[in-house]
Amino acid sequence: AAATIILLRKLFNGESKTKKMSISNLYKIANKLGSDVPACLESKSLKISSYGNKIKRIKLSNNYYYLLVNPNIQLSTKQVFSHFSCFSHDIPKNKKIYLGDVSIYNSLLSSAISLAPQIHTILSVLKKLPNIIACGMSGSGSTCFGIFKDLKNILPVYNYFEDSNFIWYGRVKDYSVNRVRCSKMLENKF
């Protein structure tokens, strides 16, 4: 949805330097489409809390290697929240995992797993890997991630998931190069 909003903004604005749809209007539209859409407009590493309305940019270390694994199952944010049984601002102490100053706990994980058990399977495989620093699920799912200190620890699991899951691995700087940088596009190009 975020990519469509950006494309529509480009088409609407055309070559005009004066009649641009404002970024604030983009965010108003994004909020109406779904609680996760404004975060997708950012296209940055973010910590999102509450119902998607509290967004904070975070800096992920480039000293680590990241593995993204998606089981090719689409979960809508609305669907995951509808299966969300309890909302608590307190993270159980035994569930806290930190990477620097960033907590990796995701309160939507149980809900997403109830809809897509493959997420549990992926995380179980990741947790068993030697030298994994942390793993979890991104947002409302279904993409899972693993964080490693060394690239050589990713390659065996990459081969395991390669045939049946969409995957990516590398450092943060590599990911930034390979994905659409929506926020840069918003700031500079349109």
Label the model's feature ranges.
Residues 1-14, 138-148:
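Short, small-residue alpha-helix embedded
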Residues 10-134, 147-190:
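ATP-dependent small-molecule kinase catalytic core of the GHMP/sugar-kinase superfamily
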